[in-house]
Amino acid sequence: IFRDLLEAMEGRDLIAACNVMAEDPPSGPHRFEYGPGVECILIPTMTLPPSTHTNCFVLGERGGQRAIVDPAIRDEDGYKLLKDKVEEIRGDGSDIVCTIFTHRHQDHLGDMDMISQIYQAPVWASEETLAALPEIQETRKLREGDEISIDGPSGRVDWEVLETPGHCPGQICLVGEPGVVAADNCTMVGTILVPSSDGDMGAYISGLERLRDLRPHTLFAGHGPLIPNPERMLTQYIEHRKARHAKVLQAVKSGCSNLSDIAISAYSDSPGANPALAQDQALSHLNELVRTGDVRKTGERFHSENPPHQVDGSSEGSNGLV
């Protein structure tokens, strides 16, 4: 509505512009503009509650080149949303130059057969993500430091690839002047899991630190609203994960050896935490502790050679996060 008001104010004062809009109100599809040249489509997906949608981003200006990030459609509702947006993009005289996937999880990776019925464009993603897709004729393997340039009426906007593989192998972010397309690193809705199956807790924390060091003014998260001035939130995420890491280590040092007991001890400050998720996240921390040599694993049990002692940060609350 703000953009419509600015257009109505050309050659008019504010009152006259409001009168023009009252006589001829804006019509047509609503555009969720998260930033300059960054539109969002809310795609319904089977993601982790409380989230119900995945953010599909359309990069670029109207009338210029466009890139579609994470078109995660897998049902008729998502198909219609993407189809309507693509028709709108074409009506603006824009060309879709590529499809970008941030990572291979199913709530971000769309059904390529459905997508190809709507539009055709090269697929750009990391090696790990491309390997999870069916054979596609035209692809580009994205790596750390690669640049994606999108031309528009106002000029060219460059996005740089940043690898943040902790949540998922091959996950990437896109860093540009409008902000950072941050994939599944943090969110204002719920929390981010680091799956014990293929996640990497050490890499996840390092990725958060890299994002914070960029001091971005906006994060475009994979789920939920945009995150303005995200440095504080990223710091909270980092401190929370490090505190939880310390609590898992302390649980092992205190004599807990099986996963269930370790999770109960490490999440004693979060009695409402889902037991299965708490165990999975505890295992992700344990995998990292085994990798760094702080914990050894024998069969299904975990041990530490060091005597029990208080670990810095082990008493810090979780605020309900995992």
Q: What is each stretch, according to the model?
A:
Residues L59, L82, H223, V248, ...:
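Residue-level signal for inorganic ion chemistry
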Residues P29-I89, C173-N185:
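Conserved beta-strand hairpin/beta-sheet module of binuclear metal-dependent hydrolase folds
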Residues R3-D4, A8-V20, P25, Q250-V322:
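C-terminal regulatory/interaction regions
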Residues L82, Y204, L208, A282:
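Aromatic/hydrophobic pocket-lining residues that form the small-molecule binding cavity
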Residues T52, I73-D158:
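Active-site HxH/HxHxD metal-binding segment of metal-dependent hydrolases
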Residues E10-E23, G37, A132-E138, D146, ...:
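Glycine/proline-rich low-complexity segments that form flexible loops, beta-turns, and polyproline
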Residues R66-I68, I73-E76, E147, S154-K247:
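Metallo-beta-lactamase
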Residues C98-H108, H167, Q171, H223, ...:
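Histidine-centered divalent metal-coordination motifs
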